[in-house]
């Protein structure tokens, strides 16, 4: 996922091993099942160590064992609350990427590549004569 650090610097956040991530979410469908009444949210928590320098909160990530518990409506509330305990974030990595990720026109693989140019002065124009 992407998070923005002020002023307008996007960061790409992923698992170090490149594996997919599952995020806890909630979905609500109105009793009459009208599409306009549907809503969904991603559950967030305080950011793990280090990631807080980029943004103060992050999605609640679910591992394979907690994913099944999250999806089980009979799971006790205490078990769900235990999933929100602090993590060390060691399985995550994050780095700056191009500001192009904020444009709906940009859609290419390179958007997740590291880009450390933010805040640097543009290259000086070569002298014409």
Functional labels for PLM-detected ranges:
Residues 1-129:
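A structured binding-face within diverse protein domains that lines the active/interaction site
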């Amino acid at each position: 996922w992407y998070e923005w650090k002020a002023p307008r610097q996007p960061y790409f956040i992923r698992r170090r091993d490149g594996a997919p991530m599952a995020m806890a979410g909630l979905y609500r469908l109105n009793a009459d099942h009208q599409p306009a009444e549907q809503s969904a949210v991603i559950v967030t928590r305080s950011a793990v160590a280090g990631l807080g320098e980029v943004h103060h909160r992050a999605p609640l990530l679910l591992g394979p064992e907690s994913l099944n518990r999250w999806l089980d409506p009979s799971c006790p509330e205490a078990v769900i609350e235990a999933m929100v305990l602090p993590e060390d974030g060691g399985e995550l990595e994050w780095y700056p990427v191009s500001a192009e990720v904020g444009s709906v026109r940009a859609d290419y693989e390179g958007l997740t590549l590291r880009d450390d140019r933010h805040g640097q002065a543009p290259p000086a124009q070569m002298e014409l004569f």
